[in-house]
Amino acid sequence: MRVVVIGAGVIGLSTALCIHERYHSVLQPLDVKVYADRFTPFTTTDVAAGLWQPYTSEPSNPQEANWNQQTFNYLLSHIGSPNAANMGLTPVSGYNLFREAVPDPYWKDMVLGFRKLTPRELDMFPDYRYGWFNTSLILEGRKYLQWLTERLTERGVKFFLRKVESFEEVARGGADVIINCTGVWAGVLQPDPLLQPGRGQIIKVDAPWLKNFIITHDLERGIYNSPYIIPGLQAVTLGGTFQVGNWNEINNIQDHNTIWEGCCRLEPTLKDAKIVGEYTGFRPVRPQVRLEREQLRFGSSNTEVIHNYGHGGYGLTIHWGCALEVAKLFGKVLEERNLLTMPPSHL
């Protein structure tokens, strides 16, 4: 069975690992390849701050809530293990701030120690009148991609730097199953009017005294269009842009100033922080994740395609749950082709 995963961000690599982990012992041979025109450190995942936190609004597809929960549980199970540091994984606590009272998020029982802020805590943030505190997880994208790449390499998965122009090209190259994890560029392979870029620009600073994340919410401007501060293992991420439809990959000085001024107002000690990097990336924005099977016919043969893209600004938050779902769909393909000799492990 020849499987090609297109895309080498967190969605592509985690999906490749999940499939190989669950089927290598029951499907011989299982040949998995990863095709991508961008590998770490040049993917959208590399730009992500890495905080596990879904959007505050409930997803239109209830399955997404389950995939978020599965991902949190998977990551939490690695806390305290020798893998955690190499994965870029660590617990982090912090604040979500609002200018008015809002309902509790649907994920309040997924994270640890969720509670509303006290009046004394709100005194620290004079521009805000309401908020939450909880403990979550940081999963640093760049380090996690390196870890995933190492795990896949150990398993014999091969990586190819190439720009895929069509599914037909991959199918005619011998792929039995194609896993489409192309993120914001999925429309190149198959038109998808629901998919748009959500441009984000971030500033990385050296500010080791900052230990808590602070995410502000402006209900009129929308998600991630107000300041946020997220400490990581090596640096602190400052952000506050979410520009739907903007394909400009060049850092913008106006966005820089907006982010810097907003975050320094939120945390004045940042004025003394050294800027160590600035990056722009595109969140693959879609009303809901596209995770489904599709059969495409090229010449006289059918090729199975499993789509897994459109994760918006929460790819790291939902990635493992989606990988598990793709693995289930892959298992159904094998069953239909009578290729599964025994049940796969861990499904």
From Swiss-Prot:
Keywords: Cell projection, Cytoplasm, FAD, Flavoprotein, Oxidoreductase, Peroxisome, Phosphoprotein, S-nitrosylation, Secreted, Synapse. It catalyses: a D-alpha-amino acid + O2 + H2O = a 2-oxocarboxylate + H2O2 + NH4(+); D-alanine + O2 + H2O = pyruvate + H2O2 + NH4(+); D-cysteine + O2 + H2O = 2-oxo-3-sulfanylpropanoate + H2O2 + NH4(+); D-dopa + O2 + H2O = 3-(3,4-dihydroxyphenyl)pyruvate + H2O2 + NH4(+). Optimum pH is around 9-10. It is an enzyme of class 1 (oxidoreductase). Its EC number is 1.4.3.3. Induction: Repressed in conditions of amino acid starvation in an autophagy-dependent manner. It comes from the Eukaryota. This is D-amino-acid oxidase. It comes from Sus scrofa. The gene is DAO.
